[in-house]
Amino acid sequence: MASVALSEAEKVYIVHGVQEDLRVDGRGCEDYRCVEVETDVVSNTSGSARVKLGHTDILVGVKAEMGTPKLEKPNEGYLEFFVDCSANATPEFEGRGGDDLGTEIANTLYRIFNNKSSVDLRSLCISPREHCWVLYVDVLLLECGGNLFDAISIAVKAALFNTRIPRVRVLEDEEGAKDIELSDDPYDCIRLSVENVPCIVTLCKIGCRHVVDATLQEEACSLASLLVSVTSKGVVTCMRKVGKGSLDPESIFEMMESSKRVGKVLHVSLQSLLHKEESLGPKRPRVGFLG
């Protein structure tokens, strides 16, 4: 993960500011930076989104392809995650430098979506035990400016919201052989419900307090962070600690309560933004180099 070198004086300045609920950039401990979200940015995908959170820039593309259901879940489709850490994001990712981080992020996403409530996987089933939709979710890290996991989870949810899956019909001939027919109408498609798709809220312990949406400088002052996956209703679906430091039970409880509080607000803002952007239709202004 991208890192930054700080002097002891800079670390003390950041820690003391957090103690007073006044961070270096003027935010409070539970405030996010400005989040920019744009969907439908990659033309050859079933759905896509780009998210900028401060200096963190994430691009997510979703590709729907037909596959075979897993043996243990014959009536469901499934999601596959791949994370690419671009060398443009930070020199540390050159060569195979970002492989470990990419694997860690992908495994975290698998844990978040490894339940029946996040996404209705049954809606991805075409023919039990034979055919289903497989959603390949590709995440590209364009720039790292702190708080990667939160930005990625927001981008994944936005991309799934934007995903259109072609409607299919299963036809059966007189001999019982099945044939799959895709609709010729590009607007005849199904969409996933993302209401229960969780977002990650990362809380970094700095001194005796914790902050959300930490910058690279703040992450350098933290020895332990808690990643909490929260739904729009404030339900925690996944939690893991990262970093070399430890967290006492009281801190974990406080951080979980903060994540629920912050997560609800984050979901409301994101859903409002996504619906507002969609209401603009194809005439909405394109921004960024992908526009």
Curated annotation (Swiss-Prot):
The record, for InterPro entries, names: ExoRNase_PH_dom1 (IPR001247), ExoRNase_PH_dom2 (IPR015847), ExoRNase_PH_dom2_sf (IPR036345), Exosome_comp_Rrp42_subfam (IPR050590), PNPase/RNase_PH_dom_sf (IPR027408), Ribosomal_Su5_D2-typ_SF (IPR020568)
**What residues bear N6-acetyllysine in this entry?**
K116
Q: Name one GO cellular component term.
A: cytosol
Q: Sorted alphabetically, which Pfam families does this protein's record hold?
A: RNase_PH, RNase_PH_C
Q: Which PANTHER family match?
A: EXOSOME COMPLEX COMPONENT RRP42, EXOSOME COMPLEX EXONUCLEASE RIBOSOMAL RNA PROCESSING PROTEIN
To which protein family does this belong? Belongs to the RNase PH family.
Q: How does it assemble?
A: Component of the RNA exosome core complex (Exo-9), composed of EXOSC1, EXOSC2, EXOSC3, EXOSC4, EXOSC5, EXOSC6, EXOSC7, EXOSC8 and EXOSC9; within the complex interacts with EXOSC2 and EXOSC4. The catalytically inactive RNA exosome core complex (Exo-9) associates with the catalytic subunit EXOSC10/RRP6. Exo-9 may associate with DIS3 to form the nucleolar exosome complex, or DIS3L to form the cytoplasmic exosome complex. Exo-9 is formed by a hexameric base ring consisting of the heterodimers EXOSC4-EXOSC9, EXOSC5-EXOSC8 and EXOSC6-EXOSC7, and a cap ring consisting of EXOSC1, EXOSC2 and EXOSC3.
The name under which this protein is listed is: Exosome complex exonuclease RRP42
From which source organism is this entry?
Mus musculus (Mouse)
